């Protein structure tokens, strides 16, 4: 991995359009996985509401760029001492090049700076790319919720 290939920065309101485009790509990609509608209900898209998200004291959004082009983002919500990555998405062309790892490292740094002691993350069942990203960052699954209609 070339550590200088990508840079991470705090999201700004001017990033709303880029976030919305990446979110659409994430939703399209996620349609193949179980639970996508539930996760969208629990972790709604943020692009259209970015100003409120950024002004909230318990959330932050980081952007990963390559040559000033947005390649991905992470949306994190803080509850007490726990930072939860509600959504992380890396554009297809930036995958397996270190963008996700660099973004997660920055998420950890920011979460620690904000007083968090633990980091959690959400991934859909079958989403091996996201699961593998988390595992490479030494984040292991600790809970699996199974369900059935009655």
Segments predicted by a language model, with ranges:
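Conserved GNAT-fold acetyl-CoA-binding loop/helix
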Residues: 24-49
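A short helix-loop-beta-strand connector motif used in the catalytic cores of GNAT acetyltransferases and
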Residues: 48-62, 84
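Conserved beta-hairpin
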Residues: 59-72
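Conserved beta-strand-loop-alpha-helix junction that forms the acyl-donor binding cleft
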Residues: 95, 121-130, 147-150
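A short beta-loop-alpha structural element at the N-terminal edge
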Residues: 6-21
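Conserved beta-strand in the GNAT
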Residues: 69-77, 84
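Conserved GNAT acetyl-CoA-binding A-motif
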Residues: 111-123
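Conserved acetyl-CoA-binding loop-helix of GNAT-fold acetyltransferases
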Residues: 90, 96-109, 132, 136
